[in-house]
Swiss-Prot record:
It comes from Streptococcus pyogenes serotype M1. The lineage of its organism: Bacteria, Bacillati, Bacillota, Bacilli, Lactobacillales. Homohexamer. Its EC number is 2.7.7.3. InterPro entries: Cyt_trans-like, PPAT, Rossmann-like_a/b/a_fold. GO terms for biological process: coenzyme A biosynthetic process. ATP binds at S11, F12, H19, G91, L92, R93, E101, W126, Q127, A128, L129, S130, S131, S132. Pfam families: CTP_transf_like (PF01467). This is Phosphopantetheine adenylyltransferase. The record marks H19 as: Transition state stabilizer. Reversibly transfers an adenylyl group from ATP to 4'-phosphopantetheine, yielding dephospho-CoA (dPCoA) and pyrophosphate.
Length: 163
């Protein structure tokens, strides 16, 4: 039987409970999942790549079939081919996400026609949540309780101690 291997990518700057919900749901659908932290060349990162990896790795520690990987200046589809991924995993919060993902899937299919894309619709409670909104809350030192994993809260508290 073919092993189903998924790749869920994002900048995870920082990881949110919405991201974790997608991973949790996907972990039951796939034999193995890679969660790929990618630097988005169109965005300036708030957290350094190694910090994002540490926060995400800690948040996903209980998942036995999930491996966190990082990539710098590479297309996710190229990493997917290298890892022998069978499916890309994408989360959809709203119609704007769908339009973006529809375009992305077109090009991914051109580059790797054998890799399918699976879309998981965000649960209602996470549809308004985004990393950019969390960064805004961090800037104004607002509570992150219930929005992000404890690893992110601990990192923010550590950063606040230094300032």
């Amino acid at each position: 039987m073919l092993t189903k291997i998924g790749l869920y990518t994002g900048s995870f700057d920082p990881v949110t409970n919405g991201h974790l919900d997608i991973v949790k749901r996907a972990s039951g659908l796939f034999d193995q999942i890679y969660v790929g932290i990618f630097d988005n060349p169109t965005k300036k990162s708030y957290f350094k790549l190694e910090v994002r990896k540490a926060m995400l790795t800690q948040a996903l520690a209980d998942f036995t079939n999930v491996i966190v990987v990082t990539s710098h200046e590479r297309l996710a589809i190229d990493v997917a081919k290298e890892l022998r991924v069978t499916h890309l995993i994408r989360g959809l919060r709203n119609a704007t996400d769908f339009e973006y993902e529809e375009n992305l899937e077109y090009f991914n299919h051109l580059l790797a026609p054998n890799i399918e894309t699976v879309y998981l619709i965000s649960r209602n409670k996470w549809q308004a949540l985004s990393s950019s909104r969390v960064r805004e809350l961090i800037h104004f030192q607002s509570s992150l309780e219930g929005l992000v994993p404890q690893s992110v809260i601990a990192q923010v508290e550590k950063m606040n101690e230094k300032t």
